[in-house]
Amino acid sequence: MAFLLITRRLACSSQKNLHLFIPGSRYISQAAAKVDIEFDYDGPLMKTEVPGPRSKELMKQLNTIQNAEAVHFFCNYEESRGNYLVDVDGNRMLDLYSQISSVPIGYNHPALAKLVQQPQNASTFINRPALGILPPENFVDKLQESLMSVAPRGMSQLITMACGSCSNENAFKTIFMWYRSKERGQRGFSKEELETCMVNQSPGCPDYSILSFMGAFHGRTMGCLATTHSKAIHKIDIPSFDWPIAPFPRLKYPLEEFTTDNQQEEARCLEEVEDLIVKYRKKKRTVAGIIVEPIQSEGGDNHASDDFFRKLRDIARKHGCAFLVDEVQTGGGCTGKFWAHEHWGLDDPADVMTFSKKMMTGGFFHKEEFRPSAPYRIFNTWLGDPSKNLLLAEVINIIKREDLLNNVARVGKTLLTGLLDLQAQYPQFISRVRGRGTFCSFDTPDEAIRNKLILIARNKGVVLGGCGDKSIRFRPTLVFRDHHAHLFLSIFSGILADFK
């Protein structure tokens, strides 16, 4: 019934709200509020502060059964559409955060609503199988239509999961098994290995490690948390492993003015990576793999050059380490290529690549040589969700049909240019503007100013996200257009002009 209601509302989308006033903000012209996708609104519409009274009441109720302090507001997903998120108090906001970068083609896309209503798809949404032992007849076909159609170069193997953390966690396990298999050679498991692994001892449980970078975020499960170094609150009180942590480059901006400094900074970090690999080998805690994000997201939208990643890949190969690229947040098209690591121009592809968020399901691609040697070694009950593969196949069709990767590249230039203009106009509030595609960000003077700007923007009808200590990040959908960027820039310019 909910999807029928959504479809009826989408059919009435031509009845637009033509007056766009945001309390306390400048008037936004109708040209800026142009609608060019059939299921979008024409602009923000604010009725209360956010969170409003209904959200506050629901937050209070939720807090009686769990800690709800992280909740921003409650949403009305039936009324949300396109690039606009509607809350339970009727506030309609331009969403440039898109559920922490996880909404690919906007809210309630008509094609997805239609897909859900088709009778032949009902059983896929009703029945969630244990895919590792009882997959449905069309499972292989749907994987080919969805995930395998966008498989990264050099990776023919795929394992689906439910989220980003379990994707990275199982990718680590895959790397450890691969590395031990190389050491073991052709022989099978020894009696000693089989016995000692049951009591968490060597040689059955070898003391391998994964090298990660300071500022990284790879998830919150035990193995992933050992490679996550973005915020202390994620890690405090949780036992962890002695695994190596390398510095990630801290680039100076504008890039063209600091070429030499940035090259030296990247060289310093790469040298430290090699030193740590050698150090941990001597400690008998061999680095089996290196994990890196194409852009450190939660840690502050930290970038490095394509050359840095090419050299990092060379170091991994030189020392026999697996090279794992975490595309959980950067994957799915938001940098202007389907996978952000495609920008690097690697001669030798990465060994393993994890994904989630905009891909609507989790999992990882890997090279043939990383294939598990026996069943149940990489396994859980669900191993993903076929209904998400069904939706993803249609999302990928829309990305191709509407040329959304080029849209992201084009609109990203509009957004980045506008942010640079605001930086020139308000250098006291904005610095280090950076981005790739619409995956953009900038720094503010401190955390307090950053948080205040995000709250003011929300009450003006724009949802933004924070990251790192003092950065604001942009994570719009792939159907974010030029006029959405201009609309945001107009609103945010007014905020900065009045900011105290």
UniProtKB/Swiss-Prot annotation:
Keywords: Acetylation, Aminotransferase, Disulfide bond, Iron, Iron-sulfur, Metal-binding, Mitochondrion, Neurotransmitter degradation, Pyridoxal phosphate, Transferase, Transit peptide
Modified residues (N6-acetyllysine): 252, 279, 318, 413, 452, 470
Annotated catalysed reactions: 4-aminobutanoate + 2-oxoglutarate = succinate semialdehyde + L-glutamate; (S)-3-amino-2-methylpropanoate + 2-oxoglutarate = 2-methyl-3-oxopropanoate + L-glutamate
Residues modified to N6-(pyridoxal phosphate)lysine: 357
Listed Pfam families: Aminotran_3
Molecular function terms from GO: (S)-3-amino-2-methylpropionate transaminase activity; 4-aminobutyrate:2-oxoglutarate transaminase activity; identical protein binding; iron-sulfur cluster binding; metal ion binding; pyridoxal phosphate binding; succinate-semialdehyde dehydrogenase binding
Binding-site list for substrate: 220
Keyword Acetylation found: yes
Entry binding sites for pyridoxal 5'-phosphate: 164-165, 381
GO biological process: cerebellum development; copulation; exploration behavior; gamma-aminobutyric acid biosynthetic process; locomotory behavior; negative regulation of blood pressure; negative regulation of dopamine secretion; negative regulation of gamma-aminobutyric acid secretion
Binding locations of [2Fe-2S] cluster: 163, 166
Transit peptide start-stop: 1-28
Main location group: mitochondrion
Keyword Iron-sulfur annotated: yes
GO CC terms, sorted: 4-aminobutyrate transaminase complex; mitochondrial matrix; mitochondrion
Record's cofactor remark: Binds 1 [2Fe-2S] cluster per homodimer.
Family from the record: Belongs to the class-III pyridoxal-phosphate-dependent aminotransferase family.
PANTHER family per record: 4-AMINOBUTYRATE AMINOTRANSFERASE, MITOCHONDRIAL (PTHR43206:SF1), AMINOTRANSFERASE (PTHR43206)
Description of how the protein assembles with itself and partners: Homodimer; disulfide-linked.
Protein name, per record: 4-aminobutyrate aminotransferase, mitochondrial
Classification lineage: Eukaryota, Metazoa, Chordata, Craniata, Vertebrata
Gene name in the database record: Abat
